[in-house]
Amino acid sequence: ETESSLGEAISEVYQAGISPFWWKITALDTEKEWQTMTATLDKYDPDVGVIILGKNAPIEQFKTWFSVARSTPHTCGFAIGRSIFWEAWEQFAEGKINKPEVSEMIAERYQQVIDIWHNI
């Protein structure tokens, strides 16, 4: 369902005469989903880039997602916000951690994601 609806949506955008420089796509779970999406992008714009969105998922999930996503020539990076900052923000808002701790926690989580990206 996801792969066909995503592919259809991408096709409709191109058929409407819109050619994005980047696509921001929620992380897909399987290689088959990425292959379908890649085939659609190749059909319309083989040079377009894809940025992966993180769905507020646990950081541990990114290793699997990045591994599959990086098998396509379109994947250029990630835009993962809540997975990096949300837990720290909640703890700060509840008074469990202070400003320096929130910054440290966010920096550590961001570094984890960068390390996963570079070590795939």
Sequence positions of predicted segments:
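Generic structural signal for short, solvent-exposed loop/turn connectors between secondary structure elements
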Residues: 1-3, 119-120
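Catalytic beta/alpha-barrel core
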Residues: 2-3, 9-33, 54
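Catalytic-face loop-and-helix region of soluble metabolic enzyme cores
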Residues: 26-120
